[in-house]
From Swiss-Prot:
Name the record gives this protein: Ubiquitin-conjugating enzyme E2-21 kDa
Alphabetical GO biological process terms: peroxisome organization; protein ubiquitination
Catalytic activity annotation: S-ubiquitinyl-[E1 ubiquitin-activating enzyme]-L-cysteine + [E2 ubiquitin-conjugating enzyme]-L-cysteine = [E1 ubiquitin-activating enzyme]-L-cysteine + S-ubiquitinyl-[E2 ubiquitin-conjugating enzyme]-L-cysteine
Gene: PEX4
Pfam families: UQ_con
Organism listed in the record: Pichia angusta (Yeast)
Superkingdom of this protein's organism: Eukaryota
GO terms of molecular function: ATP binding; ubiquitin conjugating enzyme activity; ubiquitin-protein transferase activity
Catalytic machinery residues: C119 (glycyl thioester intermediate)
EC number: 2.3.2.23
Length: 188
C-alpha cells in the first residue's frame, strides 16, 4: 500500500467515525457525506449542505473528488457535480423514498456553472499537505458564504455582487436551487 493510499485510508476512517457520531463537530461544517467510490481510494464522492445564513442555506450539493497519486503533496481535483437540463428533468421525474434531494447546478461566482469547476486558491497554488479532504470541503462551504467576485468563474453572479445587488443575487440562487434540485443520482 502506497503512502498516498495509507493517508487516504486514515482520512476515510476519521471522517466515517465523525459522520456516525451524532454530536461530532463535522455536522456543523456542512459536510453531509464523504467517501471513496467503489473503484478504489483515488475517486471520492461528497455531499455538502449550504452554510447557515447564506442564500445556499439548507440546500445540498454533490461533489466529485479525484485524488492524484502524489496526494497530499498535490491537491485533489474537486468539482461540483453538474448535469444538463435533460438529465435533471429525468431525475426530477423520479420519486425515491429516503433519497436526498440535491442541486445539480451551482450558481456561485467562483464556480463554473457548466462544469462545476471551483476557483479556490487552496485547491491550486495555496495547497499544503496539511490540508485534508475534509478541511478542503469545509473551505468550499466557507466559500459559498463568502464569495470572491474579483476572481470569478461565473461572471453573471460575480457582477451582481460587484454591483452590490445582493437581493438579485439571493433571488437567483434560490431560483436555481428550486429549478435544478432532484433526487440524488448514483451516476457519480
Amino acid at each position: 500500500m502506497s503512502s498516498t493510499e495509507k493517508r487516504l485510508l486514515k482520512e476515510y476512517r476519521a471522517v466515517k467515525k465523525e459522520l456516525t457520531e451524532k454530536r461530532s463537530p463535522i455536522h456543523d461544517t456542512g459536510i453531509v457525506d464523504l467517501h471513496p467510490l467503489e473503484d478504489g481510494l483515488f475517486r471520492w464522492s461528497a455531499v455538502i449542505r449550504g452554510p447557515d445564513q447564506s442564500p445556499f442555506e439548507d440546500a445540498l450539493w454533490k461533489l466529485e473528488i479525484d485524488i492524484p497519486t502524489n496526494y497530499p503533496l498535490d491537491p485533489p481535483k474537486i468539482k461540483f457535480v453538474v448535469f444538463g437540463e435533460e438529465k435533471i428533468r429525468q431525475l426530477q421525474r423520479k420519486t425515491s423514498s429516503g433519497a436526498r434531494k440535491v442541486c445539480y447546478k451551482m450558481p456561485h461566482p467562483n464556480v463554473n456553472f457548466k462544469t462545476g469547476e471551483i476557483c479556490l486558491d487552496i485547491l491550486q497554488q495555496k495547497w499544503s499537505p496539511a490540508w485534508t479532504l475534509q478541511s478542503a470541503l469545509v473551505a468550499i462551504v466557507v466559500l459559498l458564504a463568502n464569495p470572491e467576485p474579483l476572481s470569478p468563474l461565473n461572471i453573471d453572479m460575480a457582477n451582481l455582487l460587484k454591483c452590490d445587488d445582493t437581493t438579485a443575487y439571493k433571488d437567483l440562487v434560490h431560483y436555481y436551487i428550486a429549478k435544478y434540485s432532484a433526487y440524488e443520482s448514483n451516476d457519480v
